[in-house]
């Protein structure tokens, strides 16, 4: 059975399965990270990841997030809370709040106070299921003043989440994982084709042979008739 057939069958199962909508705060702990240490000495020879809004922004959306630049040392982590892997992060203050960044940690990390943190109740909801659902929620609906964007943890906790049985959640996750894998493959292929296009575009239009080995090398002596004109002369 192909992935589309499985998806259709799953939709039929969901329609008959008992689904209860619950506030996020009832099925997960919704909180925020720690204030960032200001002393640069706390980051010297650091080994403990400290996730900032900028880290999340660089990735934008990822269910396998680990790309964290700053690392704290033993002194820097004193008094800070460590967040478990599978914690979902999203910006809660600043302009990036409007961009719907969403990631899920794959490593235990310390987290900036500018990020909201969501860690699910393992007995009620699967981490990936919760991430996939939250990924299609537009947090702009919770921001009253777009000129001063901010999200309150209390408002995030009110987001309603559909909770089917764990067995159904697992099947949903399995299919969405397949689509995510397919999307990543297509994006990689598209990036490759884009690089190929750029290479051949530059090769074919390089009349001055600035990149070396371009069209000028292949047609030596035949490009003397090429005339350079201003754009205004030809358009």
Regions found by a protein language model. Name each.
Residues 1-14, 56, 209-214:
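Accessory (non-catalytic) regions of SAM-dependent nucleic-acid methyltransferases
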Residues 1-4, 16-20, 160-194, 198, ...:
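Amphipathic alpha-helical segments
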Residues 12-34, 218-235:
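Non-catalytic DNA-recognition/assembly elements of restriction-modification systems
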Residues 27-39, 54-85, 232-235:
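Sequence-specific dsDNA recognition surfaces
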Residues 52-53, 67-135:
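A short beta-sheet element
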Residues 59, 98-99, 120, 135-145, ...:
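Long compositionally biased, domain-poor regions of proteins
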Residues 109-116, 147-164:
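A short glycine-rich beta-alpha junction/loop motif
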Residues 190, 194, 201-208, 215:
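Coiled-coil heptad-register positions
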């Amino acid at each position: 059975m192909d992935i589309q057939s499985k998806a259709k069958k799953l939709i039929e199962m969901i329609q008959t399965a008992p689904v209860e909508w619950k506030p996020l705060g009832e099925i997960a702990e919704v909180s925020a990270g720690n204030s960032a240490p200001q002393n640069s000495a706390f980051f010297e020879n650091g080994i403990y990841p400290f996730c900032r809004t900028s880290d999340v922004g660089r990735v934008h959306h990822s269910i396998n997030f680990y790309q964290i630049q700053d690392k704290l040392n033993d002194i820097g982590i004193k008094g800070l809370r460590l967040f478990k892997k599978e914690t979902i992060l999203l910006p809660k203050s600043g302009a990036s709040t409007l961009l719907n960044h969403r990631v899920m940690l794959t490593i235990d990390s310390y987290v900036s106070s500018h990020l909201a943190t969501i860690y699910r109740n393992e007995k009620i909801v699967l981490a990936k299921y919760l991430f996939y659902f939250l990924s299609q929620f537009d947090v702009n609906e919770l921001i009253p003043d777009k000129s001063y964007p901010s999200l309150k943890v209390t408002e995030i906790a009110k987001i309603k989440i559909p909770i089917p049985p764990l067995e159904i959640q697992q099947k949903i996750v399995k299919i969405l994982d397949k689509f995510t894998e397919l999307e990543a493959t297509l994006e990689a292929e598209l990036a490759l084709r884009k690089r190929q296009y750029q290479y051949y575009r530059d090769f074919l239009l390089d009349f001055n042979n600035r990149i070396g080995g371009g069209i000028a090398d292949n047609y030596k002596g035949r490009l003397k008739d090429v005339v350079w004109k201003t754009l205004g002369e030809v358009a």
